[in-house]
Swiss-Prot record:
Keywords: ATP-binding, Covalent protein-DNA linkage, DNA replication, DNA-binding, Endonuclease, Helicase, Host nucleus, Host-virus interaction, Hydrolase, Metal-binding, Multifunctional enzyme, Nuclease, Nucleotide-binding, Nucleotidyltransferase, Transferase. A motif (RCR-3) lies at residues 103-106. It comes from the Viruses. The lineage of its organism: Viruses, Monodnaviria, Shotokuvirae, Cressdnaviricota, Repensiviricetes. Its cofactor is Mg(2+); Mn(2+). Belongs to the geminiviridae Rep protein family. ATP binds at residues 221-228. A motif (RCR-1) lies at residues 15-18. This is Replication-associated protein. Residues 8-116 form the CRESS-DNA virus Rep endonuclease domain. Divalent metal cations, possibly Mg(2+) or Mn(2+). A motif (RCR-2) lies at residues 57-59. InterPro entries: CRESS_DNA_REP, Gemini_AL1_CLV, Gemini_AL1_REP, Gemini_AL1_REP_central.
Amino acid sequence: MPPPKKFRVQAKNYFLTYPQCSLTKDEALSQLQNLETPVNKKFIKICRELHENGEPHLHVLIQFEGKYQCTNNRFFDLVSPTRSAHFHPNIQGAKSSSDVKSYIDKDGDTAEWGEFQIDGRSARGGQQTANDSYAKALNAGDVQSALNILKEEQPKDYVLQNHNIRSNLERIFAKAPEPWVPRFPLSSFTAVPEEMQEWADDYFGSGSAARPDRPLSLIVEGDSRTGKTMWARALGPHNYLSGHLDFNGRVYSNEVEYNVIDDVAPHYLKLKHWKELLGAQKDWQSNCKYGKPVQIKGGIPAIVLCNPGEGSSYKEYLDKEENTGLRNWTLKNAIFITLTAPLYQEGTQAGQEEGH
């Protein structure tokens, strides 16, 4: 009769199952952390489940820095802190650490320690089809969750294509900017110049079908604290571009009625998208952020807000001889307004609180 086969498991990843174990997951985690092993432990994850009969059991994944050889089948036994009871596990080497981790995660009642180690040989670390992994990433709900899935299941792509993957996921999961809620109603602005009010009435007073194909834009120049920003932002759904242009999907929407361009230096706008924005041009691309081109739907006017003075005033900038051609084009595509007084009356709520 052959001698009984000696117990021996040699693996970097261990999958333990404790049937009928009354310990909490935190009690078990503490005991497993304190086990002395010749190979450093890197990650422990525990799930506590209830059988149909109500009896609890634990599933555990332990990852070591290198292969750990276990020849004592009682090594991973746990001890009850309140009574004389030992809990003995079924011990297996885990070929796919990711599969075990996914299995443990399924019920959600988990505890963990350390950082999960990606295993390139696991079914989720290279052999799983890319389509499965990317479909799972698309269903993850947010950028970071999707990245975590691809890091685990497609580590090669995650390392070599990280920038492109992150950029694509940020665009896919981008949420439309929250609608801006004006602090003051339009009725607060009782001193709007007639030509400026006519522009607003002509554009916002008609439905989208009745608006011109390329509506005129508006350039408003005036001192600080005249109410021009609050007025412009109270007219309807808009994009607010302040100081620079950013067409990232997290801050810019193609589903608004107009753009507000505030304190953007005229020489900067000339270098970027002067004619596209002020000319209400349709279907153009931008790569202002040195990333992949962003498709802009366009077809909406811009309200440009600026202060007087060198470097800020659009009128002064266009009056320069080298900008004659741009000035002639702009006069055909925008209305210029120069404010000589605030757009509100002193004593109104807007007059008391206007800060720009």
